[in-house]
Amino acid sequence: MIASINNRTKLNFFHLLVTMFRIYPNNTTVPGCLVGDIIQVRYKDVSHIRFLSDYLSLMPNVAIVNEYGPNNQLVIKRKNKSLKSLQDLCLDKIAVSLKKPFRQLKSLNAVCLMRDIIFSLGLPIIFNPALLQRKVPQRSVGYFMNSKLERFANCDRGHVVEEKQLQSNLYIDYFCMICGLNVFKIKE
């Protein structure tokens, strides 16, 4: 998405030049209003073009607004509030496709195996911990398994683990939040 500002910048009003190559080969110009850091686009300006409101609502700094809400106020119109960007949508799609071999993660070894599969996908390194956090259940490691584990304050790459993470017994807390490597070792 490329924003081109016209001569009415004093009113914080400009036209968005939206390029959707696969859906429409030509550029589409949409009027928008800059409010703070968010570009507000009226729903009636984009409702006549198929998929355009959905495409714009995936942008993190664009809000689709409906003027005809209660008390004539602007009401932000978003279909899915949990997805804020195209990157989040792609990560959720990958997380759903990874769900099939791992229906239940009952041990830390199964989580490590799933983590290795995530690493083998070839995604950029910054996406691996985010995808791991989406897939690992918010459940604690059992007392018997926890007594066999030794936890570290640093991962193998030298990233420091927070004190709050060391005190918690959730599955995700046994992995580095920056790179996704183990911060534990099984005692012998």
Swiss-Prot record:
<protein>
    <recommendedName>
        <fullName>Uncharacterized 21.7 kDa protein in GP41-PNK intergenic region</fullName>
    </recommendedName>
</protein>
<dbReference type="InterPro" id="IPR057201">
    <property type="entry name" value="DUF7879"/>
</dbReference>
<dbReference type="Pfam" id="PF25303">
    <property type="entry name" value="DUF7879"/>
</dbReference>
